[in-house]
Structure formats: C-alpha cells, structure tokens
Amino acid sequence: MNTLMQLFIFIGTMTLVFSCVPDVKKDSVVLMSDSQRGETLVAECMLCHSNKEAQRGPILHGMEMWYLMDQLEKFRSGVRGKLASNRSEYLMGVGARKIKDDFELAYVANWFSEQDPLPAIRTVQGSLEEGKKYFNQRCASCHGGNGEGNRLLNAPSLQRLEGWYFLEQMRKFRSGERGYHSQDIGGQAMAAASQEISDRNLRNVVAYCVDAFGPEEELSNRDRLAPNKSVKPF
C-alpha cells in the first residue's frame, strides 16, 4: 500500500475517532479541583517535564490538550513505552501507569495545556533555507505552514517542540523505536513518512522549525556567563 493511500485511510479513521471522543475536560477539572491528587500528579510530572529539572524530559507547557491526552493514553495502555531499548519512553510508560483513570489523565493534560510556553535552549544546527524548503515539501501539508498542527489529521503542533527532542523523536520514528505498534495509527504514519529522510535533512528541518515558529530561545549557562565568545580556534 503506498503512502498516499495510507494517508487517506488514516484521515478517515481519525475523523471517525474524534467524532466519538467525549468532552472530558470540564468534568475532569470539576472532579479533581477540590483534591490534592491532581497537584500531586502534576508535581510528579514536573520532576522531568520542565526546563529546570534533573531528569530531562521534553517541555510540555502549552501543548494541545488533545495531543497530550492521546500520548498519555498510549503510554498508559502500552501502545508506547514498551521497548526497554527505548529507555526514555520505557520510563515514561512506567510513570504514566500511575495515572488511575481518564479523569486524572485529562486533568494532567489540561494543566499542561493551560500553562504558558517555556523558553528552550537551541541545540540543533542546520541550514534554515534547506530546512524551510524540505518542510514545505514534506511536512506542511499535515502540520501546517507555521507548524500549527491539524487535529483532524492527528497532526500535532510543532510550535512547542524543543530542538533536541524534535530531532530525537524523528530519529526514533525512522529507526522503528516509535510508531511500531499496530494501534499507534499516527505514529505509524510518521514512521512511514520518515523512512527516507537523511540525518542532514532532519537537522535542517528541525533547525528551521525551531527558528521559524518554535519556543522562545533561552540562553545556555555558557552564553549567559560568557556572552562574548572567544574567536580563538581552541
């Protein structure tokens, strides 16, 4: 089956899925607003998912609620995070299974989606010109010209992704460490789309996305402490 046919099937499937998804956002907030359980869950997430933590997970602040719920459910159910070789996702799977039910899952997703986006250090370098060209040719049709995403296509926004995490996930899609499960429809589509992308093009695309519409740049400790970089070659 060619990629175009897979995409048409994927679009039809996701349209049906989202038409049946209940609106749990309001109920989840009401049910958990008077307890400390929600705050405890968020605090545990923040041990890894902020820009100040010791265990470095991706920043989730400001991401779309629907996408966070989708990925959390995949981790909780084992659609993601079952490969021990993929250590970061394996650990995330362990953490996600602490979420007891759909209301707790929705509370966590809602909390992160309502936070202001955090700045991020830019670590991926590449050709912005080549990256823009490749993005418009291969990525914009699903993720939007400004990386805003498209829920009907199950294509998340790219505007909150840190460069290092963005590049890491694209490599995992390409290698089969992500998008391997038969129930991960969106992941399988991305895995198929990334098979022929070279590492150079991956870096160019990520560098362009982060520069054009990614998180606000945060200076590294080195740049803050030594803003005037040495011109010496050593």
Regions found by a protein language model. Name each.
Residues 1-8:
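Bacterial N-terminal signal peptides that target proteins for export
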Residues 21-41, 53-56, 110-135, 214, ...:
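Electrostatic cytochrome c docking/interface patches
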Residues 34-77:
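The feature marks the first
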Residues 38, 42-52, 108, 131, ...:
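The canonical Cys-X-X-Cys-His
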Residues 54-61, 76-106, 115, 120-126, ...:
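Axial heme c-ligation environment in periplasmic c-type cytochrome domains
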Residues 120-151, 155-160:
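Extended amphipathic alpha-helical interaction segments
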